[in-house]
């Protein structure tokens, strides 16, 4: 799993971006967040995640709050 920091996340639209440790950004969709209840992330929050190749490129999967 990789570590990263939430760059921004729009809870209304259900997606955002995580900055990877190498400086690249990766797309994150709320459905990839591993938590109960309302699935959202906060700007600046530390997370761990896997990276999968989606239809539009790299995207985060199995996102867990650190």
From Swiss-Prot:
Q: Which GO terms describe its molecular function?
A: DNA binding; nucleic acid binding
Query: Subcellular localization, per the record?
Result: Cytoplasm
- Start and end residues of each CSD domain: 4-63
GO CC terms: cytoplasm
Q: What induces it?
A: In response to low temperature.
Pfam families tied to this protein: CSD
TM stretches of this protein: none
InterPro entries referenced in this protein's UniProt entry, alphabetically: Cold_shock_CspA, Cold_shock_domain, CSD, CSD_CS, CSP_DNA-bd, NA-bd_OB-fold
Q: Which GO terms describe its biological process?
A: regulation of gene expression
Among Gene3D superfamilies, the record links this protein to: 6.20.370.130, Nucleic acid-binding proteins
Query: Where does this chain mainly localize?
Result: cytoplasm
Q: Which UniProt keywords apply?
A: Activator, Cytoplasm, DNA-binding, Stress response, Transcription, Transcription regulation
Name of the protein: Cold shock protein CspC
Give the source species.
Bacillus subtilis (strain 168)
Taxon lineage:
Bacteria, Bacillati, Bacillota, Bacilli, Bacillales
User: What gene is this protein translated from?
Assistant: cspC
